[in-house]
From Swiss-Prot:
Induction details: P450 can be induced to high levels in liver and other tissues by various foreign compounds, including drugs, pesticides, and carcinogens.
Name this protein carries in UniProt: Cytochrome P450 3A19
Top-level division of the source organism's lineage: Eukaryota
Membrane topology designation: Peripheral membrane protein
GO molecular function: heme binding; iron ion binding; oxidoreductase activity, acting on paired donors, with incorporation or reduction of molecular oxygen, reduced flavin or flavoprotein as one donor, and incorporation of one atom of oxygen; testosterone 6-beta-hydroxylase activity
Function (record text): Cytochromes P450 are a group of heme-thiolate monooxygenases. In liver microsomes, this enzyme is involved in an NADPH-dependent electron transport pathway. It oxidizes a variety of structurally unrelated compounds, including steroids, fatty acids, and xenobiotics.
Compartments (UniProt record): Endoplasmic reticulum membrane; Microsome membrane
Major location (coarse): endoplasmic reticulum
Amino acid sequence: RHEVELVAQTTIFIFGGYETTSTSLSFIIYELATHPDVQQKLQEEIDATFPNKAPPTYDALVQMEYLDMVVNETLRMFPIAGRLERLCKKDVEIHGVSIPKGTTVMVPLFVLHNNPEFWPEPEEFRPERFSKKNKDGINPYVYLPFGTGPRNCVGMRFALMNIKLALVRILQNFSFIPCKETQIPLKLYTQGLTQPEQPVILKVAPRGLGPQAEPDFL
């Protein structure tokens, strides 16, 4: 019994931590490569916050507004968990819809995050949706990359900090550029976790050397 539980917990750690974070980073870097103006603006914020490639600190990372906007917009477009499932604990009625106790309720996050009723031109990558000016106007229940309430993702803060730290360290040293193998637009596999249908292929250029670097894979 203990061996089965150990395997189950290990599997949860891998899928809940490693796979989700790495896939989110792939989506973010893809969007930066296909939106060079956003990539440049983010690198300028990074260079201003950590001059001369200084090691990132927690206090500085949490103050980086544009980095937060880029991460949030990518998680809107590509929520790694395409849906949330919750078990109804008691009979309830919401807007005239009766939900009996014991019913599994599914929230389709990918559809919610790409609904033009809440997100004008949802297929467009616009970090400004999450600017200080616009953020307060977002209904908290239409943006749920980590769920919400007492059952939201327990690793949310850790995951966001890992993603931001990785992005800063990578973008301090490299820029990303589309190449002929880059799939535009990106096709998604949405059975289970949201992920690219094919590997994301981009050119990786050391900062300052321009687009002549050889392609690498993400």
